Amino acid sequence: MIVEEAAEILEGQLVAVIPPSVQHLIMIGDHKQLRPIVHFIRLKKRHHLDVSMFERLVNCELPFRQLRYQCRMRDEFVDLLRELKLYEELKTNDKVIA
């Protein structure tokens, strides 16, 4: 099963749609960007509902792969992201025209 934008999905919603027959779960997303939207502030704070299952697994240091080469941004943006220590390993693909 492949889950796109996994960092934006509430953990309960994700668990609810995983059928018992699933042998592999591939989650794609960016845990450093958008988080799940929770409208009940008290529940969100008390139970950390704004942290997705994807982010929890990354924070628990389970094995994951991170994008190393990007093909959409200008080099200046990539340099800024590295300076801010958000994506220190990120590089621009040689074929990017900017």
Locate the predicted segments by residue:
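Conserved helicase motor core of SF1/SF2 NTP-dependent helicases
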Residues: 1-98
